From Swiss-Prot:
InterPro entries: Arginosuc_syn_C, Arginosuc_syn_N, Arginosuc_synth, Arginosuc_synth_CS, Arginosuc_synth_type_1_subfam, AS_cat/multimer_dom_body, Rossmann-like_a/b/a_fold. Homotetramer. Interacts with NMRAL1. Interacts with CLOCK; in a circadian manner. Forms tissue-specific complexes with ASL, SLC7A1, HSP90AA1 and nitric oxide synthase NOS1, NOS2 or NOS3; the complex regulates cell-autonomous L-arginine synthesis and citrulline recycling while channeling extracellular L-arginine to nitric oxide synthesis pathway. It is found in: Cytoplasm, Cytosol. One of the enzymes of the urea cycle, the metabolic pathway transforming neurotoxic amonia produced by protein catabolism into inocuous urea in the liver of ureotelic animals. Catalyzes the formation of arginosuccinate from aspartate, citrulline and ATP and together with ASL it is responsible for the biosynthesis of arginine in most body tissues. Indirectly, may be involved in the control of blood pressure. SUPFAM superfamilies: Adenine nucleotide alpha hydrolases-like, Argininosuccinate synthetase, C-terminal domain. The lineage of its organism: Eukaryota, Metazoa, Chordata, Craniata, Vertebrata. Its EC number is 6.3.4.5. The modification Phosphotyrosine is found at Y87, Y113. Binds and is activated by Bj-BPP-10c, a bioactive anti-hypertensive proline-rich decapeptide, part of the C-type natriuretic peptide precursor. L-aspartate binds at T119, N123, D124. This is Argininosuccinate synthase. Belongs to the argininosuccinate synthase family. Type 1 subfamily.
Amino acid sequence: MSSKGSVVLAYSGGLDTSCILVWLKEQGYDVIAYLANIGQKEDFEEARKKALKLGAKKVFIEDVSKEFVEEFIWPAVQSSALYEDRYLLGTSLARPCIARKQVEIAQREGAKYVSHGATGKGNDQVRFELTCYSLAPQIKVIAPWRMPEFYNRFKGRNDLMEYAKQHGIPIPVTPKSPWSMDENLMHISYEAGILENPKNQAPPGLYTKTQDPAKAPNTPDVLEIEFKKGVPVKVTNVKDGTTHSTSLDLFMYLNEVAGKHGVGRIDIVENRFIGMKSRGIYETPAGTILYHAHLDIEAFTMDREVRKIKQGLGLKFAELVYTGFWHSPECEFVRHCIDKSQERVEGKVQVSVFKGQVYILGRESPLSLYNEELVSMNVQGDYEPIDATGFININSLRLKEYHRLQSKVTAK
C-alpha cells in the first residue's frame, strides 16, 4: 500500500498513543513520533525505543520546559489567571506550548498531518487543534477518538489492551491507577475512573507532587520572591540562603518547597468548553505560591482603577487560555494590555510556606504607591480630614435620591 503521507503524532509512550501509532501505520501513514519534555516524570529514552520498535519513522524528543515557563506560565502569573475562581490552568497552558512544537516539526519534516490522542469529550482536542490551525492553516488533523472507525473499534481500555497484545505493543506491567493523570512542570491533574463520582473523596495515595499537609514539616519555609514587571526573577530561602534566579531553576525550586509543605491541592468541578461539567483534582505547588505573592506585590504597586481593569482582563485571559484561544487576536491583545499593566509591578514579597498554606509576611518595592506618612493614624501628612466631609456628602447624594424614590414607591 502506498503511503498517505507523513503524520506527526503527539506521543506519550502510554497505551493510547502507542495503539494510535500502530493504527495510523495500518491506515497507511508514515508516523513521526513527537514527545514533549514539559517537566513530567518520564523515561524519554525508553519511550523513544518503544516508538521506533512500533514502527515510527522518526522520533523527536523536544525539551520545551524553559519556553513553557517563560512564554506561558509567566504571562499567567502576571495576569493572576484563575479559571472559575480556582483552577490555575496547568494543563490549559501546556497544550499550546506542546502543539506549537508539533507544528514546527511537521513543517520541518514536510508532514501534511498531525495527530493526537485527546478524547472527543474533552478540552484538549480543542486546544491542540486551534493552535495547529492558527500556526499552520493548511495542516490536516487526524483525531482518532473522533473517528467512528476508531472509537467503534476501541470502546474502552480492554479493547486497547487486546489490540496491543495482537500487535506486540508492550503493556505496562504495573497496575493502572483507577483514574487518569496528566503531568507537566506546572501541575498534575487526576480525572476519570473512580473520580467521576464527585462524591468520592480522593484516595490517600492519589497525590504525587505534594505531601499530605498534615504530615508536612512542623516548621515553615520562609521565602523572599523578587518580581520585575510582574515576573518572578529571584527566590531566596531566608532560612538557609538558597537562591535561584533563572526561570526554570526558580520554578522547580518553588515546586520542591511547596510540594514538601503540601501546597497547591484543589478538588473541583469545572465547566468544560465543550459544554459538560467534569471533576478534576489538581496539584499546582509553585503556581500557588506565585499566585499569592504576585497578587500581593501587584496590589502594593498598582493604581486602584488600573487594577480593576486588569482584573477583568485577567478573567478574560483565563477563559481564553482554558478554551484554547491562546493564538487568537483577542488573547494577543489581552496579553499586551496585561504586559502594560505590569510595568510598575516590581519588588520583593516574603511568604511563609507551611502545612498546605501560603502566608504573606511582608513586602517592599521602589515603585510602591503606599505612602506610610499619608496613611498613618499618628501623622496628618498632606491630607485635611475636613475634606472627607464633602467627599462623603457628594457620594451620599445618589443614595439619598434612590431611597427618596423608594419611599414614594413603598407608600403607594
